[in-house]
């Protein structure tokens, strides 16, 4: 254990050497022993556990890394400062190891709740993304317990594919979530997965998954209390969250969600008791008056609206009858009905009462969207730490007035990283652009050239694209190129595919890759960025900007700024799936990006200081040709495509006349003249054809067949 005393020195009387270099001891303040229950007494033990993990894993500290981790430990143990803190510890910087070191010591202390520090700490809540991680931490905390000794930690995890695939179904009939009968199962009353929430109060260390945390935010009071076997009650005062939780919540009000919320309400209580029938009748009447009828009025009122989305003012909602007084009355009836706080009806009513920005959106049906930024709180002290390597890029952390961003980033140069930026716009690298005729074939041609070149320097390449494209693109690659890329299996078992956006988060499977190619950008629907702009709006500036927007809301600066930050965040995470997360390594790493927005590239350069950026303005000519020969107009081949395909069918050394070309393609004289002036046709003539003669005597001879049909 480190020395459990604090030495403080007055700023006005800092020690300085006398003539004989002796320090005057009287200038020091008296030594003050730490209190017996001071959690800072654990700091030395945590660092010792951290050193042990680094040693057993064959890792060494980078310059300044141990000091940075020690400072984080000190902050975590300092309960004099309450609040929510974001810890921007870079991916690969020791976050997971630090969490395990903290839990190792917390578990040791919590085995004896008579320990003063254990009593002051009360217990810990830990939140992870995956059930497998939770299982691992539960086992870590409970390691070394004597027979009959109560568990120190418990994972609260319900029915999901992972648990069922581990054989945790009591009846043995469910192997996936879709197989589980849930409440209709004959063993539902005794199923530990369905009744997981009954075990909240059984151990000092409680392990949750992100999905459950998101359900209960912002109030985590139900997760703070627990009792020993003798009934002694304790309050957990610390929560450690691995990666940023879903702090932006979006409540959607539509005919579908109103119906679903009402059906859920009716199913909660038995209607046989007369009093309950009366209560349901009163609740339904209030619900219809406050929400259903006003929404129907709004739907009729907006039926002629030309815009797809727009901000809704409080006056517009009040005009259709969606008023605060009516909604508060519904809230009172929901309380009398004892509706669960996270039930859809309660959430919808609370959201509509919020003063945050709301907007309507036309998709398949009218939707009123109410985004909000959640915080973390309880009815007692609960210090919260969110460990996120990209916290500075996440607006819900960096711009959240309720969260303090700790200055804990490790200084590092990324000279070994080169970012290649492909800018050629002949192929739109969006989801829509890559579904256009010929786009995927053109991309495959580019990759056929690029992959062998990159693999020669780096070995296997992490090529990531959209999920809808991941199987098709893999099949289009020649066998030689398929062996140069990482592959994964489609979740539905339909076969191998390329890794895809949204499917590699948190994976260490590609940690040895030194080249990453992102084919496309990991964008989500524009409406999502609009929601985030309204939710993350501490001073109301975004709402004001969007209220006066003359153009589409998703094109407004505040929404585009949200998009840029989230794209940069996702691309940084993608880069760290590779060997780049091996800090201190000198192996060169390449990141290929296709048509990233300028602001996104700037954010990446700021995040990766000293990295090199290589702009690639054009794709190979055969990629351009592949797009041009497949171009369509109103479902039929374009005139340019018809002419190009006819020219490519001419064997090398053979001749053809314009009249023959018009006959083969069905083009008129004017259409032929227009098509022959197209840049792609001009380029093909420049590289593979010569013409001689003029007028009716003109002939066209193919002299090269490098782009043979």
Place the predicted regions along the sequence by residue.
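ASCE RecA-like P-loop NTPase motor cores
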Residues: 2-709
């Amino acid at each position: 254990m480190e020395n459990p005393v604090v030495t403080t020195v007055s700023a006005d009387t800092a020690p300085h050497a006398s003539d004989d270099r002796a320090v005057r001891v009287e200038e020091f303040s008296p030594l003050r022993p730490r209190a017996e229950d001071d959690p800072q007494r654990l700091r030395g033990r945590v660092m010792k556990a951290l050193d042990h993990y680094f040693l057993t894993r064959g890792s060494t500290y980078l310059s300044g890394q141990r000091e940075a981790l020690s400072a984080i430990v000190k902050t975590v143990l300092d309960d004099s400062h309450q609040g929510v803190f974001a810890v921007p510890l870079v991916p690969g910087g020791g976050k997971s190891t630090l969490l395990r070191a903290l839990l190792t010591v917390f578990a040791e202390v919590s085995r004896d709740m008579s320990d003063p520090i254990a009593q002051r700490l009360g217990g810990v809540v830990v939140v992870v993304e995956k059930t497998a991680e939770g299982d691992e931490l539960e086992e870590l905390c409970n390691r070394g317990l004597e027979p009959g000794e109560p568990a120190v930690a418990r994972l609260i995890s319900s029915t999901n594919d992972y648990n069922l695939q581990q054989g945790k179904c009591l009846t043995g009939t469910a192997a996936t979530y879709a197989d589980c009968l849930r409440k209709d199962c004959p063993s539902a009353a005794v199923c530990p997965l369905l009744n997981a929430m009954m075990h909240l109060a059984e151990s000092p260390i409680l392990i949750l998954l992100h999905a459950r945390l998101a359900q209960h935010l912002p109030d985590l009071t139900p997760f703070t209390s627990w009792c020993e076997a003798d009934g002694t009650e304790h309050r957990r005062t610390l929560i450690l969250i691995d990666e940023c939780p879903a702090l932006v919540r979006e409540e959607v009000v539509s005919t579908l969600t109103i119906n679903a919320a009402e059906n859920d309400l009716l199913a909660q209580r038995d209607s046989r008791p007369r009093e309950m029938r009366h209560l349901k009748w009163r609740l339904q009447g209030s619900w219809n008056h406050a929400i259903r009828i006003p929404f129907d009025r709004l739907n009729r009122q907006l039926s002629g609206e030309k815009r797809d989305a727009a901000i809704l003012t409080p006056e517009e909602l009040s005009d259709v009858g969606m008023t605060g007084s009516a909604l508060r009355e519904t809230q009172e009836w929901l309380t009398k009905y004892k509706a669960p706080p996270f039930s859809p009806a309660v959430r919808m009513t609370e959201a509509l009462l919020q003063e945050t920005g709301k907007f309507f959106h036309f998709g398949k049906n009218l939707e009123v969207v109410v985004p909000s930024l959640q915080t973390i709180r309880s009815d007692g002290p609960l210090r919260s730490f969110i460990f996120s390597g990209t916290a500075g890029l996440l607006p819900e952390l960096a711009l959240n007035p309720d969260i303090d961003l700790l200055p804990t980033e490790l200084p590092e140069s990324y000279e070994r990283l080169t970012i290649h930026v492909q800018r050629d716009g002949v192929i739109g690298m969006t989801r829509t652009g890559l579904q256009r005729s010929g786009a995927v074939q053109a991309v495959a041609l580019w990759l056929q050239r690029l992959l062998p070149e990159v693999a020669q320097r780096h070995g296997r390449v992490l090529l990531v694209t959209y999920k809808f494209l991941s199987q098709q693109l893999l099949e289009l690659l020649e066998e030689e190129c398929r062996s140069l890329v990482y592959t994964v299996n489609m979740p539905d078992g339909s076969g191998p595919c390329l890794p895809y956006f949204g499917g590699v988060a948190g994976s260490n499977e590609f940690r040895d890759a030194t080249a990453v190619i992102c084919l496309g950008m990991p964008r989500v629907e524009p409406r999502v960025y609009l929601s985030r702009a309204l939710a993350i709006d501490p001073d109301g500036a975004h709402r004001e900007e969007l209220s006066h927007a003359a153009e589409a809301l998703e094109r407004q600066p505040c929404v585009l700024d949200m998009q840029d930050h989230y794209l940069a965040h996702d691309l940084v995470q993608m880069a760290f799936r590779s060997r780049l997360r091996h800090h201190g390594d000198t192996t060169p790493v390449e990141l290929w990006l296709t048509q990233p927005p300028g602001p996104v590239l700037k954010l990446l350069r700021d995040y990766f200081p000293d990295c090199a950026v290589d702009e690639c303005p054009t794709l190979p000519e055969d990629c351009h040709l592949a797009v041009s020969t497949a171009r369509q107009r109103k479902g039929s081949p374009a005139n340019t495509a018809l002419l190009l395909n006819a020219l490519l069918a001419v064997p090398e050394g053979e001749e053809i006349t314009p009249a023959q070309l018009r006959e083969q393609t069905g083009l008129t004289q004017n259409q032929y003249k227009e098509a022959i002036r197209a840049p792609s046709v001009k380029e093909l003539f420049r590289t593979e054809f010569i013409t001689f003669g003029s007028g009716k005597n003109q002939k066209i001879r193919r002299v090269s067949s490098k782009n043979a049909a």
